[in-house]
Amino acid sequence: MENAGALQLLSAAAAAVAVVVVVALRWLLARRAAGGWKQRPRLPPGSTGLPLIGETLRLISAYKTPDPEPFIDERVARHGGVFTTHVFGERTVFSADPAFNRLLLAAEGRAVDCSYPSSITTLLGARSLLLTRGAAHKRLHSLTLTRLGRPASPPLLAHIDRLVLDTMRHWEPAATVRLLDEAKKITFNLTVKQLVSIDPGPWTESLRREYVKLIDGFFSIPFPFASLLPFTTYGQALKSRKKVAGALREVIRKRMEERGEESGATEEAESKREKKDMVEELLQAEGGSFSEEEMVDFCLSLLVAGYETTSVLMTVAVKFLTETPAALAQLKEEHENMTNMKGENQPLEWSDYKSMTFTQCVINETLRVANIISGVFRRANTDIHFKGYTIPKGCKIFASFRAVHLNNDHYENARTFDPWRWQSNHKLQNEVGANLFTPFGGGPRLCPGYELARVVISVFLHHLVMRFSWEAAEEDRLVFFPTTRTLKGYPINLRQRS
């Protein structure tokens, strides 16, 4: 009897449980059908690595070598072109997919906003061109384009020509120079001139030395109390940032005082006054001038952009040409033919620059293989859906241009320097249109100084091949962290051409 009673109780309990399960399942299915029950977002696959550190150390180790590609290659092979990792203190979705990169660049200010590691944000300043958003960024971008986006201006082209020649005149007829250092002198002095109209001298050289320390801190890890420890890379960078900002602030205050003394000028006369540099553009901007701190951050960030990126490209282009004799020979022939047509010792003009067709192929290929801008950081403002995955709102995203540029599916022998691949008239247009070639970014944040950078590199290569022959003084190699550069600054032995 007891057994029979127990069996009945068990049967009743099982029936009750079954009813509860059925009711619960029906309720859950109904909620899901009505949209009231949301599935957890399906993130792109990947690994977040070690606690707190994530995969940051692996990424840094890879990018401090001449061949950083395995870091992304291995993850793309395992997870696909969009994968999840954890770097620089937070979970990050990496994209090596040109279609997703195109989406991110076009969605700036809507689905995504720019977002960089805290070390960069602190060192550049919140009001810098790289970090401002919305209407503020649009205004600064427009001003930068006005000042730096017109390299065809005869005075600007003449200044670039003169600055390159002045630098090379200090080279001995037979000497060893560290090319990256010399290229940085050119780009830094050019940018300072465009920003504050100060010619090369002790002030600019002192400023440049501090800039070197500032840039070294960009991708350092700002661990707690690092700012209080001056012996750390980040601590030194913060100290140099204060010095650079202070030097720029003095110049800006002096200009503001001078404008105050000239306040009697009519509004019409003021509008016709030539804006000699970027500070003048900022002080006379439509809609009112900028605050002192806005101008300091803005000028500081433009110095970083003009100083570092173009000088590295100049150096790497020479390295690639030295290692590719056929390309160097064709480049020399192009510039010798141009010089023979216009005559020696004649200043370069815009028509000369436009005739340097193979030079542009060399620049394109240098940008593709070893661009200093390997990609851009963004942060999702809303959930982003792509190929069945969901990148949730607030997630950090890195669009890797380098991964696309060096993908054999997009470029034949992608990791070989081959400037002839750009000789097709439609190659550049097609690659840019498909977002396979994005050395200057894209969308609303397309680099406003990209044409100026091309002009500076072209003028530099022209005078180098026409005045000197050279060879590598010692073996040097590329590394890619914190930015692309040659490990030793690429020293070369020069011989002046007769």
Curated annotation (Swiss-Prot):
- GO molecular function terms attached to this record: heme binding; iron ion binding; monooxygenase activity; oxidoreductase activity, acting on paired donors, with incorporation or reduction of molecular oxygen
Q: Name the coiled-coil region(s).
A: none
Q: Where does heme bind?
A: C447
Instruction: Give the signal peptide as a residue range, or say none if absent.
Output: none
**Per the record, a Pfam family?**
p450
Membrane topology recorded in Swiss-Prot or TrEMBL:
Single-pass membrane protein
Compartments (UniProt record): Membrane
Name any cofactors this protein relies on. heme
Reactions it catalyzes? (22S)-22-hydroxycampesterol + reduced [NADPH--hemoprotein reductase] + O2 = (22S)-22-hydroxycampest-4-en-3-one + oxidized [NADPH--hemoprotein reductase] + 2 H2O + H(+); 6-deoxoteasterone + reduced [NADPH--hemoprotein reductase] + O2 = 3-dehydro-6-deoxoteasterone + oxidized [NADPH--hemoprotein reductase] + 2 H2O + H(+)
- InterPro entries assigned: Cyt_P450 (IPR001128), Cyt_P450_CS (IPR017972), Cyt_P450_E_grp-I (IPR002401), Cyt_P450_sf (IPR036396)
Q: What is its EC number?
A: 1.14.19.79
Q: Which residues cross the membrane?
A: 5-25
User: Any idea which UniProt keywords this protein has?
Assistant: Heme, Iron, Membrane, Metal-binding, Monooxygenase, Oxidoreductase, Transmembrane, Transmembrane helix
Region Disordered: start and end of each range?
A: 257-277
| Pathway(s) annotated for this protein in UniProt | Plant hormone biosynthesis; brassinosteroid biosynthesis
Q: Name one GO cellular component term.
A: membrane
Please classify the protein's predominant subcellular localization into one broad category.
Answer: membrane
Q: Which family does it belong to?
A: Belongs to the cytochrome P450 family.
PANTHER family assigned: 3BETA,22ALPHA-DIHYDROXYSTEROID 3-DEHYDROGENASE, CYTOCHROME P450 26
Q: What does this protein do?
A: Involved in reduction steps of the biosynthesis of plant campesterol-derivative steroids, ending to castasterone (CS) but missing brassinolide (BL). Catalyzes the conversion of (22S)-22-hydroxycampesterol (22-hydroxyCR, 22-OHCR) to (22S,24R)-22-hydroxyergost-4-en-3-one (22-hydroxy-campesta-4-en-3-one, 22-OH-4-en-3-one) and of 6-deoxoteasterone (6-deoxoTE) to 3-dehydro-6-deoxoteasterone (6-deoxo3DT, 6-deoxo3DHT).
Name the UniProt record assigns to this protein: 3beta,22alpha-dihydroxysteroid 3-dehydrogenase
Which species is this record about?
Brachypodium distachyon
